[in-house]
Curated annotation (Swiss-Prot):
Gene3D superfamilies linked: EF-hand, SH2 domain, STAT transcription factor, all-alpha domain, STAT transcription factor, DNA-binding domain, STAT transcription factor, N-terminal domain
Subcellular location: Cytoplasm; Nucleus
Motif (Essential for nuclear import): 150-162
Superkingdom, taxonomy of origin: Eukaryota
Modification Phosphoserine occurs at: 727
Modification Phosphothreonine occurs at: 714
Protein role: Signal transducer and transcription activator that mediates cellular responses to interleukins, KITLG/SCF, LEP and other growth factors. Once activated, recruits coactivators, such as NCOA1 or MED1, to the promoter region of the target gene. May mediate cellular responses to activated FGFR1, FGFR2, FGFR3 and FGFR4. Upon activation of IL6ST/gp130 signaling by interleukin-6 (IL6), binds to the IL6-responsive elements identified in the promoters of various acute-phase protein genes. Activated by IL31 through IL31RA.
Record-listed Allysine modification sites: 601, 615, 631, 685
Entry GO MF terms: chromatin DNA binding; DNA binding; DNA-binding transcription factor activity; DNA-binding transcription factor activity, RNA polymerase II-specific; protein dimerization activity; protein homodimerization activity; protein kinase binding; RNA polymerase II cis-regulatory region sequence-specific DNA binding
Membrane-spanning parts: none
Name used for this protein in its record: Signal transducer and activator of transcription 3
Pfam families: SH2 (PF00017), STAT_alpha (PF01017), STAT_bind (PF02864), STAT_int (PF02865), STAT_linker (PF21354)
Length: 770
């Protein structure tokens, strides 16, 4: 069954997470229409190869055109309009950046797969009964639903009682006026007063009953408001706070955030009940004006009840105004909350009170550092202006689910220049990537005679002026959201708190799992812990300072732990993503562990790991071999960097890697990928197939061109491989050699097969720094 069809069969709680994956960057509507085709493409490979990404992107546009033609024949105007709009958007955003849409789609597909796995695991283990956390959450939500239903029922019951009281009051008013009129006539005629006294007693009984019902209604209203206050506190202080914390976690690569639809339904339901209750309290005022008496409970309690319901509704509306999508540059979707000056960023706000009458009524204004002007000057932070479309009206049409929201797509920041280069105080203690800024959203609500000022803030953002500041800026975002749920602590880095290894390890794994299909294993994390904290047995609970994580150089290195790791993450995403997703790259492994696992393997077994000495990120392979005396040798090649991987894929490097011995014989030392996977099975599918066409002859030459092939070679003048140089040296324009170094025989077509070796380094022998 297709993945998309499987997703449609999941429970609501999983479907809510699915909705959260999609946005305007890659509409769910397109995912639905092109599901089979989308799932048949290798988006992960396209995300790492621009040429393939371009091909897939143009094929995507072609698929959209086919769907458009189908809807044109069916005269489906709505889908025609939507597809035309989607295609125009994709062309405007991704035509020059096809790898970006490939990365987005690849991540969505992977998150979908992870969602299916989570659901399957829950089903296999007996559902939520075997998952205490999930069960507690579900039980809490069920209790909340029951409380909301109870509130709605009590509101309706009160509505009926109000009608009974109103009818009783009308009867009392009629009888009272009738008796008064008859009494006046009797006074004029001097008639007997006994009938009048009897009717007066009846009126007194009616008034007593009316008073009892009024007191009952006032008491029930007070109890209802207390129930509303409890439900509201649960919604805002627990459910909404939990969602905001999950949003923080999702921003730094954690599990996808659960969408807001269910929370919106709860809050809207409560808001509707509150407005209905407010109308009931206003009705009490009308009843009071009709009939009032000494000790009237309405006179005593109505003002307080009205004050309470208005305050509850105001607070609910203020809490319901949230940032649904945190500020993010479209070019860096996996690193929200980092904004570069002069570069557009997007963000989205939402009101979780879904009142149709508020559609197109709320104008949102955006500003930055609204409440921190004096603080910014005091601590020397830069100041910025927001440019672009910084006002927008909330509406229900732009969102897929009809929520009341406003998405800002064309915002940019410009620094206010001061005399000292933009810093308000040249003695500022924080570097620019530790400065935190708040983006504020404001609006006013006018509803049923109430004016409510709404304001919400983004999570703190880091503003950079150069993309080279991105790694340190992202480190700040990670550290902040890992250690605090305070949404407005812009002075966080004046005294950054200490994290534990358990917290750091989880976040580090997210940096891989959020952009690839694989997080970090316990063994890989242990290796990273050793680099951060030194040798140890149990790192759980060990403390890590902000400086240790990001600012101080590692022992014996000229760069920090985070700079090194971030460059490896970049290397994985751009150059070796497919191999990482397959689990072929062991990555982080100590040299002792490396030697231990390879020494028991047959010669030619290799593993792939990251360089520990390359600041810019490097990947290498280590293999085992036997010397002429049968002694096991472990060899490593000098790490390949991004610059080298730009010219040749790592899979092709491994498949073609040779050693040239003193007799000029080419030998391939790599046979298996650890533990025992033939290298052809592991890497062959990631190599470009060799062209079967014969090259054309130069018009000025009688003979055809000879084929060329780039491979990496390590030359050695040694008689055996005991002293094999560790660095990859390559030879240029070596002709006449076949796979085993023997003279190539002419082919049937009279051509010679030839190998051209890319010569980048000239030293014949070198010792690896690894």
């Amino acid at each position: 069954m297709a993945q998309w069809n499987q997703l449609q069969q999941l429970d609501t709680r999983y479907l809510e997470q699915l909705h959260q994956l999609y946005s305007d960057s890659f509409p769910m509507e397109l995912r639905q229409l092109l599901a089979p085709w989308i799932e048949s493409q290798d988006w992960a490979y396209a995300a790492s190869k621009e040429s393939h990404a371009t091909l897939v992107f143009h094929n995507l546009l072609g698929e959209i055109d086919q769907q458009y033609s189908r809807f044109l024949q069916e005269s489906n105007v709505l889908y025609q309009h939507n597809l035309r709009r989607i295609k125009q958007f994709l062309q405007s955003r991704y035509l020059e950046k096809p790898m970006e849409i490939a990365r987005i789609v690849a991540r969505c597909l992977w998150e979908e797969s992870r969602l299916l796995q989570t659901a399957a695991t829950a089903a296999q283990q007996g559902g939520q009964a075997n998952h205490p956390t999930a069960a507690v959450v579900t039980e809490k939500q069920q209790m909340l639903e029951q409380h909301l239903q109870d509130v709605r029922k009590r509101v309706q019951d009160l509505e009926q009682k109000m009608k009974v009281v109103e009818n009783l009051l009308d009867d009392f008013d009629f009888n009272y006026k009738t008796l008064k009129s008859q009494g006046d006539m009797q006074d004029l005629n001097g008639n007997n007063q006994s009938v009048t006294r009897q009717k007066m007693q009846q009126l007194e009984q009616m008034l007593t009953a009316l008073d009892q019902m009024r007191r009952s209604i006032v008491s029930e209203l007070a109890g209802l408001l207390s129930a509303m206050e409890y439900v509201q506190k649960t919604l805002t202080d627990e459910e909404l706070a939990d969602w905001k914390r999950r949003q923080q976690i999702a921003c730094i690569g954690g599990p996808p955030n659960i969408c807001l639809d269910r929370l919106e339904n709860w809050i809207t339901s409560l808001a509707e009940s509150q407005l209905q209750t407010r109308q009931q309290i206003k009705k009490l005022e009308e009843l009071q004006q009709k009939v009032s008496y000494k000790g009237d409970p309405i006179v005593q309690h109505r003002p307080m009840l009205e004050e309470r319901i208005v305050e509850l509704f105001r607070n609910l509306m203020k809490s319901a105004f949230v940032v649904e999508r945190q500020p993010c540059m479209p070019m860096h979707p996996d690193r929200p909350l980092v904004i570069k000056t002069g570069v557009q960023f997007t963000t989205k706000v939402r009101l979780l009170v879904k009142f149709p009458e508020l559609n197109y009524q709320l104008k949102i204004k955006v500003c930055i550092d609204k409440d921190s002007g004096d603080v910014a000057a005091l601590r020397g932070s830069r100041k910025f202006n927001i440019l672009g479309t910084n006002t927008k009206v909330m509406n229900m049409e732009e969102s897929n689910n009809g929520s009341l929201s406003a998405e800002f797509k064309h915002l940019t920041l410009r620094e206010q220049r001061c005399g000292n280069g933009g810093r308000a105080n040249c003695d500022a203690s924080l570097i620019v990537t530790e400065e935190l800024h708040l983006i504020t959203f404001e609006t006013e609500v006018y509803h049923q005679g109430l004016k409510i000022d709404l304001e919400t803030h983004s999570l703190p953002v880091v503003v950079i002026s150069n993309i080279c500041q991105m790694p340190n800026a992202w480190a700040s975002i990670l550290w902040y959201n890992m250690l605090t749920n305070n949404p407005k602590n812009v002075n966080f880095f004046t005294k950054p708190p200490i994290g534990t290894w358990d917290q750091v390890a989880e976040v580090l794994s997210w940096q891989f799992s959020s952009t690839t299909k694989r997080g970090l294993s316990i063994e890989q994390l242990t290796t990273l812990a050793e680099k951060l904290l030194g040798p140890g047995v149990n790192y759980s609970g060990c403390q890590i300072t902000w400086a240790k994580f990001c600012k101080e150089n590692m022992a014996g290195k000229g760069f920090s732990f985070w700079v090194w790791l971030d460059n490896i993450i970049d290397l994985v995403k751009k150059y070796i993503l497919a191999l990482w997703n397959e689990g072929y790259i062991m990555g982080f492994i100590s040299k002792e562990r490396e030697r231990a696992i390879l020494s028991t393997k047959p010669p030619g077994t290799c593993l792939l790991r990251f360089s520990e000495s390359s600041k810019e990120g490097g990947v290498t392979f280590t293999w085992v071999e036997k010397d002429i005396s049968g002694k096991t040798q472990i060899q490593s090649v000098e790490p390949y960097t991004k610059q080298q991987l730009n010219n040749m894929s790592f899979a092709e490097i491994i498949m073609g890697y040779k050693i040239m011995d003193a007799t000029n014989i080419l030998v391939s030392p790599l046979v298996y990928l650890y533990p025992d996977i033939p290298k052809e099975d592991a890497f062959g599918k990631y190599c470009r197939p060799e062209s079967q066409e014969h090259p054309e002859a130069d018009p000025g030459s009688a003979a055809p061109y000879l084929k060329t092939k780039f491979i990496c070679v390590t030359p050695t003048t040694c008689s055996n491989t005991i002293d094999l140089p560790m660095s990859p040296r390559t030879l240029d324009s070596l002709m006449q050699f076949g796979n085993n170094g023997e003279a190539a025989e002419p082919s049937a077509g009279g051509q010679f097969e030839s190998l051209t070796f890319d010569m980048e380094l000239t030293s014949e022998c070198a010792t690896s720094p690894m």
